[in-house]
Amino acid sequence: MWITQEITPYLRKEYTIEAKLLDVRSEHNILEIFKSKDFGEIAMLNRQLLFKNFLHIESELLAHMGGCTKKELKEVLIVDGFDLELAHQLFKYDTHIDFVQADEKILDSFISFFPHFHEVKNNKNFTHAKQLLDLDIKKYDLIFCLQEPDIHRIDGLKRMLKEDGVFISVAKHPLLEHVSMQNALKNMGGVFSVAMPFVAPLRILSNKGYIYASFKTHPLKDLMTPKIEALTSVRYYNEDIHRAAFALPKNLQEVFKDNIKS
């Protein structure tokens, strides 16, 4: 048996699996979890794959990309995703997290897949809301959008940022789908003073890219090394990974030169 990951519309990967462990379907999402000899458990969420053995890569990168460039991290918002491991990493900063996800059926089905599921859900500083309107009106130090946002989503979320707040969003991989990344940078750059693409260095099982955006905060100039050195129980993230995440090959520097704002 095998499952197929669509990297781009023209590129696919196949993974051998041993068994299907779970199949859950809701109105808007489909979650399947498989057992794999080489990769442990693999979750397929709407055709996108998550590897249980490597969940820490994305969660550490995103959490500390934001956390180590901000002096204070009191309020964090996570929207359009299910990644509770991201919240687990963010709790290293003693912050409050608002997590917006309407699909409780799918979220609760990750109970055995996310290693820190119960720890996060039971944390007194974690608030799960079905929609943004259910939350108290406030400004955030850090906002994560775990699906690529359109211009209207960007406009709505940027109004919820503090003046020096950071907005981190998922995008297409700049090497695999540079036109899509270019368009995403245009959307972000039309709103923010800083808009820079990055990827997870040495992560070979992903087709994701990301964008770091802010009105005032810069992901490299404002990086605080003492905060990185103070982190405990991290397996992937360090200062070298942080800086390397923003490195681009020369051809992509040319492609994005009019879209990157730094």
UniProtKB/Swiss-Prot annotation:
It comes from the Bacteria. One of its GO terms (cellular component) is cytosol. Keywords: Cytoplasm, Polyamine biosynthesis, Spermidine biosynthesis, Transferase. InterPro entries: PABS, SAM-dependent_MTases_sf, Spermi_synthase, Spermidine_synt_N, Spermidine_synt_N_sf. One of its GO terms (molecular function) is spermidine synthase activity. The active site is at D155. Residues 1-249 form the PABS domain. S-methyl-5'-thioadenosine binds at N29. It is found in: Cytoplasm. Its EC number is 2.5.1.16. It holds the Pfam family Spermine_synt_N. Inhibited by methylglyoxal bis(cyclopentylamidinohydrazone)(MGBCP). The keyword Transcription regulation does not apply. It catalyses: S-adenosyl 3-(methylsulfanyl)propylamine + putrescine = S-methyl-5'-thioadenosine + spermidine + H(+). Spermidine binds at D83. GO terms for biological process: polyamine biosynthetic process; spermidine biosynthetic process. Pathway: Amine and polyamine biosynthesis; spermidine biosynthesis; spermidine from putrescine: step 1/1. Belongs to the spermidine/spermine synthase family. Homodimer. Involved in the cell growth and proliferation. Catalyzes the irreversible transfer of a propylamine group from the amino donor S-adenosylmethioninamine (decarboxy-AdoMet) to putrescine (1,4-diaminobutane) to yield spermidine. Spermidine cannot be used as an aminopropyl acceptor. This is Polyamine aminopropyltransferase.
